[in-house]
Amino acid sequence: MNDSLFVSLDRLLLEFVFQYEQDISTKEEMIQRINKCCEDIKENKVTICRIHETINATDEEIDHYCKHSEEIKDNCRNWKPTCDVFRKHEDYMQDQFTVYQGTVEKDKEMYHDYICQYKEVLKQYQLKYSETPFSREYYEKKREHEEIQSRVLACTEQLKMNETIFMKFRVPAPFPSLTKWTLNIVNLRCETQDILKHASNLTKSSSELKKEVDEMEIEINYLNQQISRHNETKALSETLEEKNKNTENRKELKERIFGKDEHVLTLNKTQSSQLFLPYESQKLVRPIKMHSSEPRVADIKEESSAKQSKLANIDFRQKENDTQIFNDSAVDNHSKCSHITTITSSQKFMQVRLLTPQKQSNSNQWSEKGDKDAEYGDKGTVRQVRESKCTSQAIYTEHFGKSVENDSDEVEERAENFPRTSEIPIFLGTPKAVKAPESLEKIKFPKTPPFEINRNRNAVPEVQTEKESPGLSFLMSYTSRSPGLNLFDSSVFDTEISSDQFNEHYSARNLNPLSSEQEIGNLLEKPEGEDGFTFSFPSDTSTHTFGAGKDDFSFPFSFGQGQNSIPSSSLKGFSSSSQNTTQFTFF
């Protein structure tokens, strides 16, 4: 029983709790609704207040407009009699306007008739007046007055034109007298002389800069060649070391296998150790077979000779390039004699070079001498190239009148007639330099590379008998003409001038240089017979003759030479095709 009661009580409690929760939730919802309704009511009250305010404002406006309408009605009632009065006055004014308009029209017609009558009377009076003599005189004077006025206007226009012309003529002329004109021209000539001197200085400085640039280029090329040679020698030395190692290994193997066949191997190695020369020189060289009883000594000598032959090949090719540059410059400078001497000397040197030594005991000495000669020979080639470039520039400035096509044709023909020859490898020569004459050493010509061969100390070669080098023979055919324009000149290009004649001409030109006045006179086209600075004017300045729009006034200028500028008798030896001066025209 108790259990059932507890269960029922529990159920009741649960139901009450559930209902209580439901009531709480409903109460909260109702509270929320009430709050919302209160807010809505407040908003509606606010809107109602606004509406009441607008209603009150509209009521006030309605009252104001009602009062204003009543005032307007009162005014209308008051203004009605005045309006009636104004209407009556308007009607009266219209009636008066119609009356006045009719009267004005009648007056117009009457006055128009009067005007017509007066015009007819005036015409009658004019006819009567024109018949009188006074009227005729009046009209004649009137016509004369009009003509005089027209003439006066034309004269005033002419006077204005003349005044403008006169004002133009009143401007002062730039040269009021002939003396001032001549002085101005003299000043202009002096200014042109100064400009020409400045231009000559600039040309000299530019030529010097060009020479320096050429020298720097030559030095750069020479350094590049040395670098390439150094690299090639390194590569060759490496290859030779590798080959030597390979040959030593092969020799050891062959000695082990074939102990008795060393004689055959030495023969094959001597055939492979020939000098490596160009194709033309190989035709003249015959292979020399070396027989020795000692195989080791022969192998060492053959290896050293092979090294020398390869180094000779490298230096030989580089010297060929240098000789080609030198020969090209010689052809451009029109020097056949220099070509002939270089060709003959180089052929003689080649004949000596092609003789191979039968003894190879001095191979180490030759290699040491070769290194010294290579350095000295390279310096000589650089000097030769500089020398050839200077001479080519000088002769180009001397013969600038000739066309470029003729020069190119002559260069090609001379290059075909005189073939280029190759030179010997530098290391085969001796460090003894070829000596030039004493007179040429004073002028400080660049030394030429050595062309002597001294393989056998006891034997004297034939080449040492020639004391003059081809580079000096090339320069011997030129003499200095003037320091300003030309550096070298020759009377006949096919003949050579000796060293004594060269010194005589050189001293004569140094003792008697051209003066500044002579150069100025030559620049201003002075005849040889005139002296001094003269002006020639006509006696009567008023009598001028004009022809073809130009004045016949003569104005010659002549600049004289100084007493010290007379050319010496020693200069008569120079027989050149062109004169010593160059003419410039400025005007």
UniProtKB/Swiss-Prot annotation:
Top-rank taxon, per record: Eukaryota
Tissue-specificity statement: Highest expression in retina, skeletal muscle, testis and colon.
Classification lineage: Eukaryota, Metazoa, Chordata, Craniata, Vertebrata
Subcellular compartments: Chromosome
Pfam families referenced in this protein's UniProt entry, alphabetically: S6OS1
Role played: Meiotic protein that localizes to the central element of the synaptonemal complex and is required for chromosome synapsis during meiotic recombination. Required for the appropriate processing of intermediate recombination nodules before crossover formation.
This protein's record includes keyword Phosphoprotein: yes
Signal sequence bounds: none
Organism: Homo sapiens
Disease connection: Spermatogenic failure 52: An autosomal recessive infertility disorder characterized by azoospermia due to meiotic arrest at the spermatocyte stage. Premature ovarian failure 18: A form of premature ovarian failure, an ovarian disorder defined as the cessation of ovarian function under the age of 40 years. It is characterized by oligomenorrhea or amenorrhea, in the presence of elevated levels of serum gonadotropins and low estradiol. POF18 is an autosomal recessive form characterized by irregular menstrual cycles and cessation of menstruation in the third decade of life. The uterus is small, ovaries may be small or rudimentary, and do not show follicular activity.
Protein name stated in the entry: Protein SIX6OS1
Phosphoserine: modified positions: S439
